[in-house]
């Protein structure tokens, strides 16, 4: 989804300058999110960062539906970039906690890389097939929700 965030802004009628400024600010928010995750650390066993992160990620995707004007687009992009860089370390910490022999963590980069390669191809096909980005955004929201469910289920099973 992030690969096409500029396209979503352009389709909503935003100028290239507006989109560029939002993406620059979003990058700063991403740095802040990563810093926040580093400051918080993963030593606490609570689930708040994962639940909050996924919730805000899904909200940010939802804000992009329906060709948002500048303010909604900016909020969505800033929130998405902040939240993704904040929640990812906590997701990876959950996965590491489930890994008893190192194989899962060894393959996680392959899975992330595969998603980064396949995601834009699938998203591009959706954008080409439909008149708006809304189906892509709905699919992204569903994928985030499924990921949350899988992380929660695996974490609960790992504690049994």
Describe the role of every protein-language-model region:
Residues 1-24, 31:
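Extracytoplasmic gate region of multi-pass secondary transporters
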Residues 7, 81, 88-98, 102:
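Intracellular helix-loop hinge segments at the cytoplasmic ends of transmembrane helices
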Residues 135-153:
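Symmetry-related core transmembrane helices of the 12-TM Major Facilitator Superfamily/SLC fold
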Residues 20-30, 80, 108-112:
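Transmembrane alpha-helical segments of major facilitator superfamily
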Residues 44-91:
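C-terminal transmembrane helical hairpin of 12-TM major facilitator-type secondary transporters
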Residues 28-32, 62, 82, 113, ...:
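Hydrophobic/small/kink-forming positions within alpha-helical transmembrane segments
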Residues 32-46, 127-128:
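Helix-to-loop junctions at the C-terminal end of transmembrane segments
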Residues 99-132, 140:
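A late C-terminal transmembrane helix in Major Facilitator Superfamily
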């Amino acid at each position: 989804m992030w690969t096409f965030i500029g396209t979503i802004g352009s389709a909503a009628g935003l100028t290239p300058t507006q989109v560029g400024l939002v993406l620059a600010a979003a990058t700063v928010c991403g740095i802040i999110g990563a810093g926040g995750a580093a400051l918080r650390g993963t030593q606490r066993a609570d689930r708040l960062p994962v639940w909050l992160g996924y919730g805000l990620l899904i909200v940010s995707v939802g804000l992009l539906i329906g060709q948002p004007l500048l303010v909604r687009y900016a909020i969505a992009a800033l929130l998405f970039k902040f939240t993704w860089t904040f929640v990812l370390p906590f997701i990876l910490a959950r996965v590491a906690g489930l890994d008893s022999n190192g194989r899962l963590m060894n393959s996680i980069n392959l899975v992330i890389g595969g998603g980064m390669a396949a995601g834009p191809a699938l998203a591009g096909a959706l954008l080409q097939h439909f008149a708006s980005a809304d189906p892509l955004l709905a699919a992204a929201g569903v994928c985030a929700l499924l990921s949350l469910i899988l992380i929660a289920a695996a974490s609960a099973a790992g504690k049994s």
